[in-house]
Structures are given as C-alpha cells and as structure tokens.
Amino acid sequence: MAAREILDSIGVGQKYCNEIIGKVHKIGNNLGLPGPAIADTLEGLEEDVYDETEVAVKYPLDVKGVDILLVTPSADFFAEPHVDGLIGYGKVFHEAGVSWTMSTKASEAGNFGMFIGSYENMRRVSLRIREAALELGVKRIVFGECGHAWRVAYSFLNTLAGPFDFLDPDYPVPQHICEFTLNEIEQGTLEFDKSENDDMSITFHDSCNVARASRMGDKAGGQFEIPRKVIKAVVNNYHDMEWDTIHERTFCCGGGGGLLTDDLMEVRVKGAKPRMTAFKNVMEEKGVTHLAAICAICKSQFTKVFPYYGMDMFQIVSVHQLVSNALVMNRKTPPEEAPGYGEDDDDE
C-alpha cells in the first residue's frame, strides 16, 4: 500500500481506481448513481417484493431517527446477484422489527482509496459515513456484503472517521450484515423454509479482504464461521471446497486490488483460475451448483469470468439472496401500506 501511495502521489496511480474515487467525491458512490436514481431503484424493489410476498417491505432512504444506517456497496442498487442481496437485507430488517435507512450521502460502502494506498482518500470516503450517521441520528451502523469495504470498516473506520461515541455502545462499530442476521437467527426471530433453496447446492468463497485482513463477530475465526452459519440456516445442501482453498488459505477472486475493469480482463481470467479449479472440483465431487460470496467485487468478477470456464454467470449468488429465498415473511402488513395504495391508475 505504501508503494501504491507513492506512485499515486506522483501522478502514476491506477486510472480506474482514481476514476471511481472521483465519482464518490462528486456524486456519492462508485457507480455515479444520483440520489433520485437510488430512490427510484428502492421504490421498484418495494413493489417487486410486495408482488412476490404481499408484504410491504420498506427500503428507506434518508430517514432520520431510525436505529440502523445500512451502508452497502452501490452494486447492490444496480445488478444481479447484488440487488438480490439488498432485497434480503430489507426482508431481514423487516422480520426483525428494526427501523433502518440508507443514505444518499453514504450510498457507497466500498473505499477504493485503499486500492491506491491513499490515506487521504480513504479518510474522505469514510467521513461520508460518519456525516450521514450524525445527520440521520442513527444508533448503529451495519455494512452490507462487500469485502474491501468491510476491511476498511473493521480495521480503520474508527481512526479514519471516529470516534463513533455518538452511537449506541451496546452494538459493535461497525457491524456486518451477516453478524446481524446470525444474531436474529440465534434469537429465533427469523423463520426459514430451507426447501426454497433446494434447487441449489452451495459452497462458499472466502473473500480475501474478509478472510485475511479483518474479523467478524467477537472471536477469532468469526469471519469464517458466521457466513457459513447463516448459509447453513437457510439451505439444505452445503459443501465446503477443499480445506487448503478456504478460510485463511482462500484464493483471490482475480478481480480485487483495483483490477475490476474490462481493460484487464485477460489478467482477471488468469487470476481466477485457482478458485475456478477448486470450485469445479467440489462441483464434480459433491454436486455443488452455486458459489456464494459476501463481496461485491468477487460477485462482479465471477459473473464475468465464469463463462470463460464453462460456467453460467448466475452460478454466483449473494449470501443474503439465499436468506431472502428461504425467509418466511410472518410480519404481515395491512393493505394501506402496500406500494401505490390509494393511487388512481385511471386516466382522467
């Protein structure tokens, strides 16, 4: 990281990463999605979830005085399988009965400042989260599925943007969405029908920024145990890949470190080979069909490189996509809370 920072400071940093950081500073997220576009996306998700479940799950934006600020990668607003994970977050919060919101100011969990080794850019991106939490008056911050975002949050957030002494001290700062979900599972507030995922047999990819550069939960190894416990709570068919290809021995997806650009596709395909080999082996030996991950870059990378290895792009799934599939929606909502209730569709 020090070498990258030196190169960036003399103007020879990674073009792709600097373009991404520029979008965050100018607009608020890596994809350059303005607030109205995010609001429109979330409104669409509410309608989709209601059509599927007849439950009015809310995906709130910029709501003050709620318990939780969810900070998630902007990929979750944009494409599969990311958006399926976002749908799952909302369903979990709904069933847990907690109040929450997302923020247009902090509409990006990712922090590409880390990839160019720039402390100043890491700090500026992180401060958006602090400012949003203060403005909205939340009690806790929960991060969505993003590997390097979790690394920055877990390892550096307090020194980059702290102190966070204005948050509720009863909760960790930050908290991962998998931690939140597992806690609700263990408390018995969530009910699942595992058979909803019986069309898949799952394995899990340990994203390197989570596996080797952070922790999760209150004990060592939680970053390995917690996501797997969540997965096993919602599926009937799960198998790990070979022991020397997972946990702290995991392989990079091939797209991390600022490589996630089509200009470097040849490098990305070659970089993915060790993980693809391990995945193919567990497919052949155990009948696994899908790979789950909790990293936006990993999911984006595998979506692109799977076809190069004879696999379907839809074989990569979000962990909270699996949660969403299996979650039984017991907290029913009255008709007047349905999206579009009271609107007159007739032309006048």
PLM feature segments, named:
Residues T104-A106, I177-C178, D206, E242, ...:
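Residues at the C-termini of beta-strands that transition into short coil/loop
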Residues M1, T72-F77, K105-I116, E120, ...:
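Local cysteine-cluster metal-coordination motifs and their immediate loop/turn environment
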Residues V83, Y154-L157, M216-G217, T303-P307:
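Short amphipathic alpha-helical segments
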Residues R123-I129, F180-T189:
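Active-site glycine-rich loop that binds ribose-phosphate moieties when present
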Residues M1-T159, G340-E348:
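Iron-sulfur-cluster electron-transfer modules
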Residues V142, C146, D170-I185:
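Catalytic core of nucleotide-activated saccharide and alditol-phosphate transferases
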Residues M1-V24, V57-V66, I87, K91, ...:
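Iron-sulfur (Fe-S) cluster-binding modules
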Residues S74, C178-T181, C208, C295, ...:
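Short, flexible loop/turn elements at secondary-structure junctions
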